[in-house]
Amino acid sequence: MLFSSVPFLFYFLPAALLIYFAAPRQLKNAVLLLASLFFYAWGEPKYMLLMLVSIVQGYGFGLLIEKHREQKASKVFLTLSILVSLGLLGYFKYADFFLSSVNAVAGLSLPLLKLSLPIGISFYTFQVLSYVIDVYRGETAAQRNFIDLAAYVSLFPQLIAGPIVRYSDVAAELKSRTHSVSAAAEGVRRFMVGFAKKILLANQFGALASVYKSTQDASVLFVWLYALAFLLQVYFDFSGYSDMAIGLGRMLGFHFPENFNYPYISASITEFWRRWHMSLGSWFRDYLYIPLGGSRKGKARQLLNILIVWLATGLWHGAAWTFVLWGLWFAVLLLLEKLALLPVLEKHRVLGHVYTLFFVTLGFVLFDADSAAQAVSRIGAMLGAGGLPLSSAQAVYYLKSYGPLLVLGILCATPLPKMIVAKLRKSKGAATVLDVLEPLFVLIPLLLGTAFLVDGSFNPFLYFRF
């Protein structure tokens, strides 16, 4: 069930909120758990048991790890829990990738399992992993209430596509959280910002990108239009979902971590990945990079650790060689910055912005490709090596049609709109006008977005496949 869908907006969410707020405090987590299981079962009923198995093993091993803390058995239980989590993830997400790779390399014909990817498995697996690891490290107490832990792992606002919420971030709020009209209003506003990003921007850029993929009239201009459209689509799609998730969390009394901080204003790839999908980046830092030694064991080991983390990041995004290459793409850029480029980029920030946007754009062309050959072909065409004409009538038509929206998208991907609103609020008169108009800022995107949804317009969600 997509957040940007009629069933969610007008049936599931109102019913879930009504029952949740009507329930007594001691039953709210149980209501959340049931609502989350229903939400998951709506789109993936056959894999709901898989998520429950992941929750049960995390709950049981968490208790055993805490019970035997400071003993060898604690590490054994941690290892078993990690193996179960990664085993489930590996089997359902990577088995066919492994088999097809073996077939291609060895010339075999091993039968593929042809498993469909369980929705959200990459996200809830990482939450269970962080929970048992934090219990082992003594950074959080094991949760003895199964319903509370299950509600944390399956919490529907962030179940499908994050942010990746660590147990320690919400442990206190699972036990006791406050609800208020102002918090709910804040949540509604944040949700509608994300909804507008998704329906009014991401979907429109996605439609333009899909036109390029289906056209026979290619040109250098059209490839660049596609690349820019996809760059904006993936940002507004994913950051919009994160905004909706954070907003839903506030409605329910939770504070989820921020996931995006205007990544396209970055002046280096290093800065970009501190601003993009921040909950995933911090997860890999704390649970893989630092345990591998981080930067504590010399420069060579640090560079190796970066390479390992980015191979894992690529694979986390998808079971395909294009994602492995995408991870390597950013690993190489980060290594080059670590070795030599960062001082230059920090000194010349304008150059840094151009460099970052250029290489991030090429990276996301690879991210979106069905094969390495397709990515090379598209990138080659962008650089003028594909033998394509510089322009075409179709490319010019779509540039004129989508030009204003592309400019709007570029501006909205910067802090400029937020800065303008903040400046207006310093004026008493302007602030009063904004307060009066605020309901319209919520209602208009809802009406426009609903019109698009009812019309059956283009409405995919990119990160559901992870």
Region spans (language model):
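Membrane-embedded transmembrane alpha-helical bundles that form the catalytic cores
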Residues: 1-465
